[in-house]
């Protein structure tokens, strides 16, 4: 059984995201003075005592307004309550009971999820009890005065949360999930792709750019293994983003790339590869992440039997630094090839984590040298490649011992990398090659030691 879920519910700007960050000991949830910063439901890992659980943060609930994303936010909150063991209902003790609080209480009475009432912004313990007493009128049980920003009262609240969680014995042991980040420019279909993958409305979809502000974590099982999918905020040029919630979401997106095992770079089939797509691809390669390139909106392209081949050639010419990444043409709208993403991503992760023995590496290098010798300078000095060994994975990294790294130009270095890929695979992952100068006698001695260790 998966870890139990605790849902955070409340109207806008009562401090839900601040409480999430407090419960999860992080700053993942975006906190900003502007109401409605959180729109989709986002997941983080929380713990208290000897229990681990998931905390799901939902958008601010408003029932007397159907403009913009408010109906979708209500739908996201209802979905969060369906999977939660308990809901924490957050209200603002300084403002007192509002009509919005009463509407939320009425909404919760129609749900099957039990609720605990937390009265936030009770910074003074003495005044907090008096402020909390007013909220008995909501009919949601005992109100617990807390200060999300300072942590006061949260221990007692969490003790009550644990009483609603299923027995720990039902959770079982679980394999660590693969972290998959869905990244791309605004409005290329990232959230639609996430919803198509999950088979439910996990993220709000809109033609308005910047709909997704947070990174949205989704846990599921595919290819017989657990995955954690992260739908990131659309990443634009920095100069086109004002300092505010969207800025923080983009910063969170770059962090999602850093903590991912594999990235799905979503390209709009109608737009082709833009300069911003190239920058994102460069970021993936720079961070050493496995990658699958997904060309979305394929259903909207007029095509014949040659279109896919021609378009792939055109796209790869502009994404030349991701020439090792598999490319998949999909439609989030129709679901075409969406399920194939996991098979390609799983293979990329496997290659990203792969290790190869020194003897096998040197067989490939020997073959490469037989086909093409290292370059010779005008002064008659020739590069010598003594041996190579894999020194790390995630991404696979190799140190190549040579007489002088300066004798190996970019052209020959690219040739060696291509030969390693042709001989050993590593589809879907970048490689890092380190060229290190060494005297021949020392290199031969070190090679013998390496081979003896691997026996």
From Swiss-Prot:
<feature type="binding site">
    <location>
        <begin position="57"/>
        <end position="61"/>
    </location>
    <ligand>
        <name>GTP 1</name>
    </ligand>
</feature>
<feature type="binding site">
    <location>
        <begin position="10"/>
        <end position="17"/>
    </location>
    <ligand>
        <name>GTP 1</name>
    </ligand>
</feature>
<feature type="binding site">
    <location>
        <begin position="231"/>
        <end position="235"/>
    </location>
    <ligand>
        <name>GTP 2</name>
    </ligand>
</feature>
<dbReference type="GO" id="GO:0016887">
    <property type="term" value="F:ATP hydrolysis activity"/>
</dbReference>
<dbReference type="InterPro" id="IPR015946">
    <property type="entry name" value="KH_dom-like_a/b"/>
</dbReference>
<dbReference type="InterPro" id="IPR005225">
    <property type="entry name" value="Small_GTP-bd"/>
</dbReference>
<comment type="similarity">
    <text>Belongs to the TRAFAC class TrmE-Era-EngA-EngB-Septin-like GTPase superfamily. EngA (Der) GTPase family.</text>
</comment>
<feature type="domain" description="EngA-type G 1">
    <location>
        <begin position="4"/>
        <end position="169"/>
    </location>
</feature>
<protein>
    <recommendedName>
        <fullName>GTPase Der</fullName>
    </recommendedName>
</protein>
<dbReference type="GO" id="GO:0043022">
    <property type="term" value="F:ribosome binding"/>
</dbReference>
<comment type="function">
    <text>GTPase that plays an essential role in the late steps of ribosome biogenesis.</text>
</comment>
<feature type="domain" description="KH-like">
    <location>
        <begin position="354"/>
        <end position="439"/>
    </location>
</feature>
<dbReference type="GO" id="GO:0005525">
    <property type="term" value="F:GTP binding"/>
</dbReference>
<dbReference type="InterPro" id="IPR003593">
    <property type="entry name" value="AAA+_ATPase"/>
</dbReference>
<dbReference type="InterPro" id="IPR016484">
    <property type="entry name" value="GTPase_Der"/>
</dbReference>
<dbReference type="InterPro" id="IPR031166">
    <property type="entry name" value="G_ENGA"/>
</dbReference>
<keyword id="KW-0677">Repeat</keyword>
<feature type="domain" description="EngA-type G 2">
    <location>
        <begin position="178"/>
        <end position="353"/>
    </location>
</feature>
<dbReference type="GO" id="GO:0042254">
    <property type="term" value="P:ribosome biogenesis"/>
</dbReference>
<dbReference type="InterPro" id="IPR032859">
    <property type="entry name" value="KH_dom-like"/>
</dbReference>
<feature type="binding site">
    <location>
        <begin position="184"/>
        <end position="191"/>
    </location>
    <ligand>
        <name>GTP 2</name>
    </ligand>
</feature>
<dbReference type="Pfam" id="PF14714">
    <property type="entry name" value="KH_dom-like"/>
</dbReference>
<feature type="binding site">
    <location>
        <begin position="120"/>
        <end position="123"/>
    </location>
    <ligand>
        <name>GTP 1</name>
    </ligand>
</feature>
<keyword id="KW-0547">Nucleotide-binding</keyword>
<dbReference type="InterPro" id="IPR027417">
    <property type="entry name" value="P-loop_NTPase"/>
</dbReference>
<feature type="binding site">
    <location>
        <begin position="296"/>
        <end position="299"/>
    </location>
    <ligand>
        <name>GTP 2</name>
    </ligand>
</feature>
<dbReference type="InterPro" id="IPR006073">
    <property type="entry name" value="GTP-bd"/>
</dbReference>
<dbReference type="Pfam" id="PF01926">
    <property type="entry name" value="MMR_HSR1"/>
</dbReference>
<keyword id="KW-0342">GTP-binding</keyword>
<comment type="subunit">
    <text>Associates with the 50S ribosomal subunit.</text>
</comment>
<keyword id="KW-0690">Ribosome biogenesis</keyword>
């Amino acid at each position: 059984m998966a870890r139990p879920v605790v849902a955070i519910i409340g109207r806008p700007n009562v401090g839900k995201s601040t409480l999430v960050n407090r419960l999860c000991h992080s700053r993942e949830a975006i906190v900003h003075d502007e109401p409605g910063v959180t729109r989709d439901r986002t997941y983080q890992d929380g713990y208290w005592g000897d229990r681990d659980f998931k905390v799901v943060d939902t958008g601010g609930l408003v029932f007397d307004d159907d403009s913009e994303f408010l109906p979708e936010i209500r739908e996201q909150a209802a979905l969060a309550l369906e999977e939660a063991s308990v809901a924490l209902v957050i209200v603002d003790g300084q403002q007192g009971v509002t009509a919005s609080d009463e509407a939320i209480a009425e909404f919760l009475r129609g749900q099957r999820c039990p609720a605990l009432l937390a009265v936030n912004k009770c910074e003074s313990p003495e005044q907090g009890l008096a402020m909390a007493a007013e909220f008995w009128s909501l009919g949601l049980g005992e109100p617990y005065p807390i200060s999300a920003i300072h942590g006061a009262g949260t221990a007692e609240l969490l003790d009550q949360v644990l009483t609603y969680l299923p027995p720990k014995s039902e959770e079982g042991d679980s394999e660590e999930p693969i972290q998959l980040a869905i990244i791309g420019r605004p409005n290329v279909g990232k959230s639609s792709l996430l919803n198509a993958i999950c088979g439910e409305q996990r993220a709000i979809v809109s033609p308005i750019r910047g709909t997704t502000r947070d990174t949205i974590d989704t846990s599921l099982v595919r290819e017989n293994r657990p995955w954690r999918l992260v739908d990131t905020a659309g990443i634009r040029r920095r100069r086109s983003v004002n300092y505010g919630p969207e800025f923080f979401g983009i910063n969170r997106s770059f962090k999602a790339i850093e903590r991912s095992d594999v990235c799905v770079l979503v390209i709009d089939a109608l737009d082709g590869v833009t300069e911003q797509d190239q920058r994102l691809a460069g970021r993936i390669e720079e961070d050493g992440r496995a990658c699958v390139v997904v060309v979305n909106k394929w259903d909207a392209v007029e095509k014949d039997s040659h279109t896919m081949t021609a378009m792939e050639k055109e796209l790869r010419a502009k994404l030349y630094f991701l020439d090792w990444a598999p490319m998949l043409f999909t439609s989030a709208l129709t679901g075409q090839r969406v399920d194939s993403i996991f098979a390609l991503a799983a293979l990329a992760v496997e290659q990203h984590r792969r290790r190869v023995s020194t003897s096998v590496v040197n067989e490939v290098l020997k073959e490469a040298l037989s086909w093409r010798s290292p370059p010779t300078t005008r002064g008659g000095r020739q590069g010598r490649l003594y041996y190579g060994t894999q020194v790390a994975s995630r991404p696979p990294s190799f140190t190549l011992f040579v007489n002088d790294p300066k004798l190996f130009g970019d052209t020959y270095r690219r040739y060696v990398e291509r030969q390693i890929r042709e001989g050993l695979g590593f589809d879907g992952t970048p490689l890092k090659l380190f060229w290190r100068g060494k005297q021949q006698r020392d290199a031969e001695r070190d090679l013998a030691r390496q081979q003896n260790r691997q026996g």
